[in-house]
């Protein structure tokens, strides 16, 4: 099995609770097809670099996946059909890291600076 990182962006009018359930549904789909999931991160509502489908913001999610290519193909097919998902990207990686992603680390750094002042 190969290792992948799957990042997707969901419309801004979706609630954070719905985004969490979407992450859980994605995890269930991967495990149902015989894959395994590693860390799952919800990055929150973030500004987009450019407009996508008239949206300036989006909810970001990241899932580390250990699965065969057909599982990834099915996941991407379902996300293309979903009205909530406005962008998705799957990257093949050599190894998964256990530490939080750079996006979450940057958020924590900013929070720490505010507390010192």
Swiss-Prot record:
PROSITE patterns per UniProt: RIBOSOMAL_S6
Residue ranges, annotated region (Disordered): 97-117
Coiled coil: none
Keywords linked to the UniProt accession: Ribonucleoprotein, Ribosomal protein, RNA-binding, rRNA-binding
MF term (GO), any: structural constituent of ribosome
Keyword RNA-binding: yes
Purpose of the protein: Binds together with bS18 to 16S ribosomal RNA.
Family note: Belongs to the bacterial ribosomal protein bS6 family.
Protein name: Small ribosomal subunit protein bS6
Organism: Maricaulis maris (strain MCS10)
């Amino acid at each position: 099995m190969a290792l992948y990182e799957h990042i997707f962006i969901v419309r801004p009018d979706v609630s954070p609770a719905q985004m969490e359930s979407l992450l859980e549904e994605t995890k269930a789909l991967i495990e149902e097809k015989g894959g395994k999931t590693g860390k799952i991160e919800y990055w929150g509502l973030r500004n987009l670099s450019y407009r996508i489908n008239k949206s300036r913001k989006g909810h970001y999610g990241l899932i580390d996946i250990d699965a065969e290519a057909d599982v990834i193909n099915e996941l991407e097919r379902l996300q293309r059909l979903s009205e909530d998902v406005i962008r998705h990207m799957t990257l093949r990686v050599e190894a998964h890291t256990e530490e939080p992603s750079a996006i979450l680390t940057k958020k924590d750094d900013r929070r720490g600076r505010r507390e010192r002042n």
